[in-house]
Amino acid sequence: MTTDILRVNTIYIISKGRPRCRTAQTLERIRYPGEWHIVCGNNDETLPQYQERWGERVLVFDWHDEITRTDTMDNLGFEKYPSGACPVRNATRRISDERGEARHWQFDDDYLGFTIWSRELGKNVVISDGAILYEAMLKIAEFGYRARMQNVGFVLDTMESHPEQRYTFSPRVFNAHNLPSTPDLFVPWVGRMNDDIINAINIWRRGGYEMSVKYLHIEFAKTQSEPGGMTDLYRNDGTARKTAYGILAAPSAVKLVFRFERYHHATAWGKLRPKLLDEKWSRESGPPPAPPKQTHSLAKSALADKWRKALL
């Protein structure tokens, strides 16, 4: 297929401090036939362990150069605080573009498996054959290419993966991202924390579109249970600060809530999505007519005069 030639289905696993890389292990276990790599920064102290274990699959970017153009949405610097995932996400986009790809996948490094809705069995089933995952992801990537989607993906194995929701979609991509590799369509990632929500906010309010399908799912390790990555930052600063970055990005649409036994964010996507308006509101049609001037009855005027004289 044309999109297959353009290369839209390569997986890049973004990882730091986790050289065993559960996602890579999972892809090997199911014998995934497609191309995949692990992307690490040159600031990672465990980089030699990655290279020893995964060899040429490890791609290294210059983290020190990347942070000079990273917008963390704060002034905390990089000496005491981790940079977050934005440097590696933006660097991965450039790596993919330089390799001649039209689109690419960005995965986290803690995936334990994948499930998919089976029409024959009428339920979600575990994917044990990597070829099934490859074909399912290729269909999503090809759709993203044809529709010029700025982000498209699939959901985590949570309540969103319930079989009843298999034909619905989510208005944002939480984890498995299929992104454009060319700078004309790619929306740069910003924010030290909560970068996935902020990226969705920036896509939607610029008139773009992103979505997650719910018939393909990721089985993942318990949140903040894996060492490395962003776990230490979340444990030290809490998820309330994570929500704060979302509020900074869209204060009218994001708020702090308490759910899943922790502080979390809630986003009113309806306040961010572009809306189709009636032609009568078009600027070419001019502004709506001014309302008629209010007229006062004689009785009200007489009463006003009475009070005015009394005050004088």
What do the PLM-derived regions correspond to, one by one?
Residues 103-108, 150-155, 210-214, 255-258:
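A structural signal for short, well-ordered beta-strand segments and their strand-loop junctions
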Residues 42-107, 112-125:
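Active-site-proximal specificity loops/subdomain of glycosyltransferases
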Residues 22-25, 48-51, 115-119, 162-167, ...:
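A short acidic (Asp/Glu
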Residues 8-12, 33-39, 57-59, 148-152, ...:
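Hydrophobic beta-strand segments of well-ordered beta-sheets in folded domains
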Residues 6-9, 18-22, 191-193, 197-312:
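C-terminal catalytic/acceptor-binding lobe
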Residues 18, 44, 66, 110-112, ...:
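Short, solvent-exposed loop/turn segments at secondary-structure junctions
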